[in-house]
Structures are given as structure tokens and as C-alpha cells.
Amino acid sequence: MKQNDPVAAYFDKLPETHKRQFEERASGANFNFQKRLTLACELGGTSSGRLLDCAAGTGEITCALLKSGRFNHATVVDVSPAMLQSARSLLTSQIKNVELEFIESDVFTFKPTDSRFDIILCLGLIAHTGRLDILLPHLKSILTPGGRIILQTTLTDHLGTRTVRALTARSEIARRGYRISWFSQRDISDACDRAGLRILETRRHNVGIPFGDRFSPWANFQLEARLEKWASRHGADAIYLLGAG
């Protein structure tokens, strides 16, 4: 672990909590983590070859993509040793016909030892790192010609996101030890333009009721399920498929 890295220290406490988000439970968080997995698989459906997950967490999304049988290599990166170990346990038990490489690293300093990647997953990362103008050119530099990046963010264009940001900014710094980064659709679009990347497709999800799970996980789950179509157009979260411009 990078010494004194507050992001690594924060996520080292969360592997079990993170894994539970992908289980079949009636909460808004579970609904949206599973939706993120589904949409990532959908956007990555035409990719094959070499995969990089640059913030793998506990590995569920990586695992789902690798089970397609289209990939022969996966490099799994995470700054948190505990998260990376959880991902290693899952992937080595579930994936048998793919060359797997596990690297504890900050994605900003990660450099592949040999080949570039056909698809790069960047999910649940940029809120904790910011620095899009450094990250996106770096990811583009390790992408094959015709390769794709899947990038996820929560958007400040959404009223619920702005409400959460306004009410939690100070407490989040105290709780995590670092400041959360927030992005609008324009922020993402402009950063892609500067990096020479194009937004090829976008998927939206997450009704985004502020603190919905705190009041009633079951009711929040019902809202997410019933308003899924609305969220596909106006949701708080966006997942982008990027390619070189």
C-alpha cells in the first residue's frame, strides 16, 4: 500500500461491505451496484483480448466480464491491499482460462510491463482521485488502437447529487481523510476532448434519492426498480464508453 494513502486506508476497511452491495438485497445501493455491473457488461460486450480494471474493488464486475470468455488476459489493479486480496480470491476461484495479474498500485503510477489493453474499466474511481486531466491521457496511452475505456461517475447535473454534496462535504473529509471529487456532464465531456477521447455511448441509472437507504432500504429499492426507465434518461450516475478520437 502506498504509505499514508488515505484512499487505500479507507477502502481497506470495506471489502465485506463492498461485496455485500452485489448481493440480491432490497436496497437502493444493491440495486445500483448490480445495475452498474449489468451496464458495464453491456458496454463491454464487443471488446475482447486484454482487460485492465484500474480500481477493481472486490472484483465482481471484472469477474462478470471475464466469464464472457472473450478475454485471454486481465490485469487487476487496486490501491487497497484488502480490496485486491478479495478480488484475487474471487477471480482465482471463478476464472480458469484467463491469464490473471494482480497489482497493488495507484492507477496514476501503474504502467503495464508489456502490451497495451483492449478495454480499461474505470468504475467507482474518479470520485476518490479526481485529476481527470492526468488520468484520461494516461489511460489512453496504455490503450490499444480501437480499444475502449468504460468510465463511471456520479453527476452534479442531478439535483440529488448536488444535495448530497452540499450536506456531506465537510463530514466526508473527516470520515474518509480526503475530499470527494464531483463532476458534471460538461466536466467529463471537456476532459475527454482534451485527452483526445470520444464519448461513444452513455448509460444513465440511479434515481438518486438523497439518503434513501438511510430512511428505508426497501422503499428505496422499490423506487429504483419502478423508476428504472426514468433513471435511464435522467439518473444520477453515468457510465461512458470512450474511444480514441
Where are these regions (language model features)?
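Conserved class I S-adenosyl-L-methionine
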Residues: 1-45, 48-57, 150-172, 213-215, 222-224
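A conserved beta-strand element that flanks and buttresses the S-adenosyl-L-methionine
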Residues: 121
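A C-terminal cap/extension of S-adenosyl-L-methionine-dependent methyltransferases
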Residues: 164-170, 201-245
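Class I SAM-dependent methyltransferase SAM/SAH-binding core
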Residues: 58-109
